[in-house]
Amino acid sequence: DGFNAAKEGRLNPFPTIEWYIHTTVDPSLRDAEGHHNSALFVQWVPYELKGTTWEAEEERYVKQLLSVCDRFAPGTSDLVADTFPLHPKKIESHFGITHGHIHHVDNTFGFADRLPYATPVQGVYSASAGTHPAGSVIGCGGHNAAIRLLKDLGIEE
């Protein structure tokens, strides 16, 4: 239902959420008081909302997402001191990513053939979220582009 909701300009009330708590693996990311930070990455969020705007819906949707978190980790929303929501229009504005899609294209089977690491411009390689296996904070695109570069230079791994 998430894809259809986004396609129709609706916000899914129970979306797929990838919940990252970065400070559990890198304590240096905690603030001066030792607070954790986390990110909720929500799949299938529309760029344009039907019948409303992101400005009108942002705060409500953050609360909705936290209520989903509360279902699986009761009390989570009570622990949140601050939020920094990045809906697609803010992602586009803040990071310059067209239509605010951090993976550039959808991560579906139909898009398994992503951008090549070696571009048509000699010596220019791509290691972005648009390359296989896509985005998130995993570094695989960079690793794979480096392997391709080594191969092109005739250097064995």
Predicted segments — roles?
Residues 2-6, 76, 91, 149, ...:
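Generic structural signal of hydrophobic/aromatic residues within well-ordered alpha-helices
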Residues 35, 57-65, 100-157:
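C-terminal structured subdomain/cap of oxidoreductase catalytic cores
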Residues 1-86:
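C-terminal segments that line or cap access tunnels to active or ligand-binding sites in enzymes
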Residues 11-20, 71-132:
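A glycine-rich dinucleotide-binding beta-alpha-beta segment and adjacent secondary-structure elements
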